[in-house]
């Protein structure tokens, strides 16, 4: 039996923890499963190891959070800092203007119209120029930095949060933008890609497919008539 240190973590636990921590944009659950089985044997599970890690990390306000992709259901693991201001913490390598821009982008995404939870490059440039006086070339450079570091993702010029950003910002978004949020009634996570019925029942795209419900289980309205959340 491997000896545990004073913090309650064995060397194998610490190895897996470091593996997850070093991948700041998150790590695929399947990769961690393979690593766990290499270290502990084929009967070991990711769930058990992560639970053991979280029991120790809890005392230091850290957590490993499992996130399910809202479109395809792929599971990733993310290291979370649960204390302080998550926006400042996630942006510590950045100068103040980038931290402020990130705060603004979070606000604009959360408050955008028509359930879109996303912004075009042009929208970000216009808002940034109006509220912060930043030139388009500067904004574009900052956006690609946020994309490179795993906080924002873009497809065809449309920007939204990554799974890692949603994991890191979960408490912050609930505290600051509770009235602008939708939560999936299946998995209880924030929805930026999904459907909301007129009755208020809400599902991620993946959760809706996985459950295979043709109609809303709350009011029996066809999901085909639901409002789409996000641009995907």
UniProtKB/Swiss-Prot annotation:
Q: Which family does it belong to?
A: Belongs to the NSE1 family.
Protein's recorded name: Non-structural maintenance of chromosomes element 1
Can you provide one Gene Ontology molecular function annotated for this UniProt record?
Answer: zinc ion binding
Please provide one cellular component term from the Gene Ontology annotations of this protein. nucleus
UniProt keyword annotation of Amino-acid biosynthesis present: no
Catalytic activity annotation: S-ubiquitinyl-[E2 ubiquitin-conjugating enzyme]-L-cysteine + [acceptor protein]-L-lysine = [E2 ubiquitin-conjugating enzyme]-L-cysteine + N(6)-ubiquitinyl-[acceptor protein]-L-lysine
- The EC designation for this entry is 2.3.2.27
Q: Outline what the protein does.
A: Acts in a DNA repair pathway for removal of UV-induced DNA damage that is distinct from classical nucleotide excision repair and in repair of ionizing radiation damage. Functions in homologous recombination repair of DNA double strand breaks and in recovery of stalled replication forks. Plays a critical role in meiosis.
Q: Which gene encodes it?
A: nse1
Q: Where are the zinc fingers (RING-type)?
A: 181-222
The Gene Ontology biological process terms listed for this entry are: DNA repair; double-strand break repair via homologous recombination; meiosis I
Q: Which PANTHER family match?
A: NON-SMC ELEMENT 1-RELATED, NON-STRUCTURAL MAINTENANCE OF CHROMOSOMES ELEMENT 1 HOMOLOG
What are the subcellular locations of this protein?
Nucleus
What Gene3D superfamilies does its record include? Answer: 3.90.1150.220, Winged helix-like DNA-binding domain superfamily/Winged helix DNA-binding domain
Q: Identify the keywords attached in UniProt to this record, alphabetized.
A: DNA damage, DNA recombination, DNA repair, Meiosis, Metal-binding, Nucleus, Transferase, Ubl conjugation pathway, Zinc, Zinc-finger
Q: What class of enzyme is it?
A: transferase
Q: How does it assemble?
A: Two subcomplexes smc5-smc6-nse2 and nse1-nse3-nse4 exist. These subcomplexes are then brought together via a number of interactions, forming the Smc5-Smc6 complex.
Highest taxon above the source species: Eukaryota
Q: Source species, please?
A: Schizosaccharomyces pombe (strain 972 / ATCC 24843) (Fission yeast)
Q: Which InterPro entries match?
A: Nse1 (IPR011513), Nse1_RING_C4HC3-type (IPR014857), WH-like_DNA-bd_sf (IPR036388)
């Amino acid at each position: 039996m491997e000896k545990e240190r004073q913090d309650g973590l064995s060397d194998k636990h610490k190895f897996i923890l470091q593996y997850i921590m070093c991948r700041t944009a998150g790590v695929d659950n399947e990769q961690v499963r393979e690593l766990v089985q290499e270290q502990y044997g084929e009967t070991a599970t990711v769930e058990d190891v992560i639970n053991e890690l979280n029991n120790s990390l809890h005392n230091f306000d850290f957590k490993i959070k499992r996130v399910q992709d809202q479109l395809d259901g792929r599971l990733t693991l993310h290291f979370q800092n649960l204390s302080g201001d998550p926006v400042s913490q996630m942006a510590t390598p950045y100068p103040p203007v980038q931290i402020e821009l990130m705060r603004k982008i979070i606000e604009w995404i959360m408050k955008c119209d028509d359930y879109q939870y996303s912004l075009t490059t042009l929208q970000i440039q216009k808002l940034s120029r109006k509220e912060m006086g930043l030139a388009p070339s500067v904004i574009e450079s900052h956006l690609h930095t946020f994309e490179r570091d795993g906080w924002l993702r873009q497809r065809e010029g449309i920007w939204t949060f990554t799974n890692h950003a949603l994991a890191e910002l979960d408490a912050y978004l609930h505290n600051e933008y509770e009235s602008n949020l939708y939560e999936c009634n299946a998995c209880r996570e924030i929805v930026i890609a999904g459907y909301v019925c007129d009755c208020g029942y809400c599902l991620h795209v993946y959760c809706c497919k996985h459950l295979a419900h043709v109609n809303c289980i709350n009011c029996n309205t066809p999901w085909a008539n639901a409002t789409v959340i996000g641009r995907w």
